[in-house]
Amino acid sequence: MCPPVSVRHGARGMSCLYGAWLYQLVHGEQMKMCFACFKAAFLLNKFYLEMGYWEQEELSEEEEEEEVWDAEPMEHLSESESLESDSKQDAGSEQDAGSEPNTRSEQDAWQGVGSLYVPQSVSEYGGPGALVPTPSWTQWVVFSISVPTELLPQEAVPLDLGPEDVEWTQALPWRLDVLFPCSHRLIPPLSWWDILDVMPSLGQPVLLELRSLWPLDQSVAQTWLQDQKFVLLLDSIHFMCHLLSMHVCWAVRTQVQHWQVLLNPGEMWVAHLKRVLFRPRGLYPWSLSILKSSDLGMELVPAAFYLRKKGFWVGSFLPWNSSIPETWSWDPGERLFITDATICATNYHFARSFFP
């Protein structure tokens, strides 16, 4: 699997560098580095590449290769000289035997001018498209021929990477062999909340880090997480609320036996609540919830509570800025049902309703 370099994360509110960091967290070899340190290492690597830090090392390697290639043609040239001397002796013996003068002159011209000379009789016989045999040692001479160019080094224009890689720095090769873990605490406790110090927006993904409370089958757990209908409770007025659907992009198990779920924002809904006993309390803005079907209809349950029942404990809810706030979820209390919901706005595309 290739890193998410050519994917347009910017349209979803995520930079390519941030997507690469997420990829390393999920698929890397137990990398324990926060995004701030990951970005600092990337910028340092970019600085070294721009300053030509590895140019001297690369030039030394190229010089060694050139020396090897220069030695090989000289060996073949020495062998060819001995072959030419033998051929001259054979030509002298044929001349004494009384060969034709035209053939003798063509052979002398061939040997005098070199392998790149084509006799006139051969070119006339074979035509413009004929293949003319040349000595075997000439294939080594081709490597030593330098082809001039009309462009000067300062006139060279870098190739355009296209719209898929608008951030040109993402195409630079990583020269860092090892990313050492930073001193910031990742596990435990998970502290990714210092990455972004703003509240979630309609175009910003949410990353959940989950821990298993008991052993779970990997394929079953992954399928169950991908099938959940996550929503963000934006606000509530009386018995009406605004919900932001959060589509599950992927759910993977990390190298440290944790689960990561990336939620991508989708449509905004206007939902009408149904009161069961009395008005539910504790509905806070930006509360992550899950819609699940029940005997009484579609029920809105807190994500932390419902995930805990299925064996998952929420370790982090990115992007909060300090720690998991008390208002990010609420206790079940009274059951909260939704009678109907309609789409009021969308950022990317229209999707079909949660309800049949």
From Swiss-Prot:
Region span, Interaction with LIRE1: 1-78
Q: Where in the cell is it found?
A: Cytoplasm
Q: Where is the composition biased (Basic and acidic residues)?
A: 73-91
In Pfam terms, one family for this protein is TEX19
| Biological process, per Gene Ontology | cell differentiation; male gonad development; male meiotic nuclear division; placenta development; reciprocal meiotic recombination; spermatogenesis
Q: Where is the composition biased (Acidic residues)?
A: 59-72
Q: Give the region (Important for interaction with piRNA) as residue ranges.
A: 139-186
- What's an example of a GO molecular-function annotation for this chain? piRNA binding
Function per UniProt:
Required during spermatogenesis and placenta development, participating in the repression of retrotransposable elements and prevent their mobilization. Collaborates with the Piwi-interacting RNA (piRNA) pathway, which mediates the repression of transposable elements during meiosis by forming complexes composed of piRNAs and Piwi proteins. Interacts with Piwi proteins and directly binds piRNAs, a class of 24 to 30 nucleotide RNAs that are generated by a Dicer-independent mechanism and are primarily derived from transposons and other repeated sequence elements.
Q: How does it assemble?
A: Interacts with UBR2; does not lead to Tex19.1 degradation and stabilizes it. Interacts with piRNA-associated proteins DDX4, EDC4, MAEL, PIWIL1, PIWIL2, RANBP9 and TDRD6. Interacts with L1RE1.
The name this protein carries in UniProt is: Testis-expressed protein 19.1
Q: Which species expresses this protein natively?
A: Rattus norvegicus (Rat)
Q: Which gene encodes it?
A: Tex19.1
